[in-house]
């Protein structure tokens, strides 16, 4: 007797394309993404063209020369978690475009959470998180971030207040 079976294999390329389509649609309609564009002085058209891809990287997401790169592991996370990283990296993407070819070596030596570019991106990310997942979860995320970077004492309280405040 011959038995024929099939297994449903995940089509990772199709999964990525589906997620990218959903991300693009969300960006075009998200009020935080639109706010970032407005406050950074760039048209909302940027949301339709910002390059985004999935790749195998160590961190959850990063931006290189304005290209947003998301860790493939985010495909397994809830969409609002994926989008909070997209919002953070969108800020960096615009920063890259606006500062094209400028390099500030002074800032390279700053602690990660002391860099103005990171503070700005995290503020938008936390605002997105608060609106989409609730203020409590946004605050927990900030606490976890401060734990991860081993920030303690008065510096921790100051950084927490800074990150939970609205972006300038």
Residue ranges and their predicted role:
Residues 87-95:
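Short active-site segment of divalent metal-dependent hydrolases/proteases
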Residues 80, 112-114, 125-168:
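Long, well-structured alpha-helical subdomains associated
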Residues 95-96, 125:
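Glutamine-centric residue-chemistry signal
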Residues 16-44:
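Zn2+-dependent metallopeptidase catalytic core
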Residues 49-80:
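Active-site scaffold of zinc-dependent metalloenzymes
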Residues 2-8:
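Proteolytic processing junctions in secreted/extracellular precursors
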Residues 122:
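Short, conserved alpha-helix that lines the donor NDP-sugar binding/gating region
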Residues 80-84, 96-119:
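Post-HEXXH active-site segment of zinc metalloproteases
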């Amino acid at each position: 007797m011959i038995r024929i079976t099939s297994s449903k294999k995940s089509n990772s390329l199709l999964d990525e394309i589906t997620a990218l389509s959903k991300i693009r649609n969300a960006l075009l309609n998200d009020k935080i993404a639109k706010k970032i564009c407005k406050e950074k002085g760039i048209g909302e058209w940027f949301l339709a063209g910002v390059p985004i891809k999935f790749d195998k990287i160590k961190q959850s997401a990063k931006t290189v020369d304005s290209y947003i790169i998301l860790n493939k592991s985010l495909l397994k996370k809830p969409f609002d978690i994926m989008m909070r990283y997209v919002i953070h990296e969108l800020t960096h993407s615009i920063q890259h475009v606006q500062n094209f070819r400028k390099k500030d070596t002074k800032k390279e030596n700053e602690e990660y959470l002391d860099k103005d570019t990171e503070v700005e991106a995290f503020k938008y990310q936390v605002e997105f998180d608060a609106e989409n997942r609730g203020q409590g979860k946004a605050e927990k995320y900030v606490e976890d971030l401060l734990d991860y970077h081993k920030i303690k004492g008065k510096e921790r309280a100051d950084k927490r207040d800074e990150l939970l405040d609205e972006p300038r």
